[in-house]
Amino acid sequence: MTSKEIRQQYLKFFESKGHLIVPSAPIVLKDDPTLMFNNSGMAQFKEYFLGNGTPKSPRIADTQKCLRVSGKHNDLEDVGFDTYHHTMFEMLGNWSFGDYFKKEAINWAWELLTEVYKIPKQNLYVSVFEGSKEDNVPFDQEAWDIWKGLIDEDRIILGNKKDNFWEMGDQGPCGPCSEIHVDLRTPEEKAQVSGKSLVNNDHPQVVEIWNNVFMEFNRKADGSLEKLPAQHVDTGMGFERLCMALQGKTSNYDTDVFTPLIEKVTQITGYKYTSNEVKNISEEQNKTNIAIRVIVDHVRAVAFAIADGQLPSNTGAGYVIRRILRRAIRYGFTFLDTKEPFITKLVAVLASQMGEFFPEIKSQQQLVTNVIREEEASFLRTLEQGLQLLDKVVAETKGKEVSGAKAFELYDTFGFPIDLTALILREKGYELDEAGFNAAMQEQKNRSRAASEVFTEDWSVLIPGNIETFVGYDKTENDVKITRIRKVNSKKDGILYQIVLDNTPFYPEGGGQVGDKGTLVSANDSSDSEQAKQTIDIIDTKKENNLILHFAKQLPENIETGFVAKVNTNLRASTSKNHSATHLMHLALRSILGTHVEQKGSLVNPDYLRFDFSHFSKVSDDQLRQVEASVNAQIEAQLQLTEHRNIPIKEALDKGAMALFGEKYGDNVRMIEFGESKELCGGIHVKNTAQIWHFKILSEGAVAAGIRRIEAITGDAVKAFYTNQENTLSEIKEVLKKPQDILKSVTSLQDDNVKLKKQIEQLLKEKIEGLKNTLVSEFQEINGINFLSKQVDLSMSSTKDLLQALGSLKPNSFVVLASIEENMPNIHCYIAKELVAGKGLNANVVIKELGKYIEGNGGGQPFFASGKGKNVSGIKEALQKAIEFVK
């Protein structure tokens, strides 16, 4: 049975049980501050478990793209070393939201595995929760009794809280779970050791394939449990492990989920991969196998993340994606001898293999290919640079142990992998101070953790069961009541309060648009005095699990009274102009550059707009002028907003509306039209494009391979921009004595500047030549070394030129020169290569020592190094100390 057939059978089975089949949510989460990525099948349904929304159906099933790089068995650095853990994986899942419970979930799981997939019953073990005195949760007798009717009692295992009580996080819905494990060992192996003893013990052929979670409780901030108002079922089955079991393999990587990718890697690199059936392989072959597993696993995670809108970067989720990709690159570099980008060539295989079920990987194939290629090329350059830096560290090392702090600097600053550092050091006969490296790493983690720690209290619910209504499309002010509040304490923001209202005109951050700001004003009817009314500033608005959260630094004195919610209309007006202009610009870009242009990210705030889009070359100045002119023409056309607030998504798409990849849409959507511009969008817009007034592009540049970014302004910001330009032009005219032709005057100045620069360069050359001829007579011969140390009156750059010239005049030369530029001392050392090789002298070491006297630092190569400092008075002593290196 192929993996495609296995996936289809799962969905078909649960469709026959009355489940609505829904598509996978994007792997990148955009509206859940507690998660960067979809790490489980249930992540997209959290709002239903929390009671903040109503699902399309009480029964749902899907296959969800998931990504994990931390947690139980999911440390990134371990992936590839075993045969059944992954960064990106598919989670087959079926859910019940207050509908069926344990009986149906367990019976259907058993029916599918044993009757449809025909896994032998004697190969299966199940576990149930043994109970917890700590949480006052009893043994799961109900699940035990159901399983007893399906499987021999000696195949039912009692599991502890770690393995058989599933929790969403530190807080939130949770409950006991019942796992199903499969034993894939040979009959001989089973006869020797019981599979029961290997369950949950990291045996590669006795693995969990399905977990049925019975959501009954809510974990509160104080750690206690309370009953949920309804019981839910949340199940997850690892697709790759299921394929391993059904295809008769003992490794996920030997299934047809991975073999096409593995075959492509072996074809590109020439290195062979051996299946898990081959035993007693060499250590070298094992390293090759691990490297190939790492690469084929990681390319899936990276490709799907990019396709869903997450580009590699240096922060947040983007950093995680970059880290995964770089791990794959370094395994290829180290163990498969790949010095050119090659992982990018796997994208076509992945798109062909999975594009039918996940069309985004097919439609975004070119973008994914280009981004990975650029990331590979960049990191391969970093690896080459890191090798040079590591050579420098080794040269400075006294003894045979390299500083862990230095290795961490290579890792942290330059991205040079620590395992590669350790490997190279061993080859050179050195050891790595691992304790020092780990200490530096832990210190950084502690700093990061302390900076990002957030303590969230439980909700205090004032009005139970209320579903918040957003009225912000029609109103900027409305009467409201507070329905719930909670306190959040973080290192970054201090104490904040999250307030939920029964209805709100405040737009929550989403779709690239920032959240509204404004005020809550108490509606105190008992007093006509405005001073008696309390005003609370709302500093931000966000959405979490279908709740609109209003952030404030304080709570009202009386939270049970009525309030008037007032949006800051000035900020909203500016934001709406920028948002509508973004739509007009998107249309213009597609018209001028081509329909390949797709939105890849945006930021819309009151000050400016930022728009990231797919395009594979720089946008020319002429094209930018065309885009600007097109947008301004649409503004001048005074296009009226046409809003379809609750239109079926199919109808909207049929009308030509653009949907954005990586966005999660419901059955009904909001569609925004300005003339030919039609987009699915939930944001705030102007009523007529004339309100935008004017559109001005400020900059255009690259964000990543195949991704460009435009920043632009509208409305009052354009007026301020032109006023500033006018003032600057007036100042320039004043400086130039108010010439009639300002352009001609500036051009004349530029020509004069070029001539003067040439004259200065000639004078400097003559000065350097004169100093060279003077100083050549001041060399001293000491122990067969031609030594010179001197302070000169030159710029730092010219001092280096003179140093090189003097060094080449005599054999065995050792020259130290110093100078002062802008009241800052600089010092430089040249050592002839024959002295570096023959006497072990090192200019880098010299500069580090002499730099102490000028309160500075520096470095370079063994034959040439430079440094800068702060203490001018230390130059004399530094030059005097230089001679000690040759005595």
From Swiss-Prot:
Zn(2+) binds at H579, H583, C681, H685. Pfam families: DHHA1 (PF02272), tRNA-synt_2c (PF01411), tRNA_SAD (PF07973). GO terms for biological process: alanyl-tRNA aminoacylation. It catalyses: tRNA(Ala) + L-alanine + ATP = L-alanyl-tRNA(Ala) + AMP + diphosphate. PROSITE patterns: AA_TRNA_LIGASE_II_ALA. One of its GO terms (molecular function) is zinc ion binding. One of its GO terms (cellular component) is cytoplasm. Its EC number is 6.1.1.7. It is an enzyme of class 6 (ligase). Binds 1 zinc ion per subunit. SMART domains: tRNA_SAD. Consists of three domains; the N-terminal catalytic domain, the editing domain and the C-terminal C-Ala domain. The editing domain removes incorrectly charged amino acids, while the C-Ala domain, along with tRNA(Ala), serves as a bridge to cooperatively bring together the editing and aminoacylation centers thus stimulating deacylation of misacylated tRNAs. NCBIfam families: alaS. This is Alanine--tRNA ligase. It comes from Flavobacterium psychrophilum (strain ATCC 49511 / DSM 21280 / CIP 103535 / JIP02/86). The lineage of its organism: Bacteria, Pseudomonadati, Bacteroidota, Flavobacteriia, Flavobacteriales.
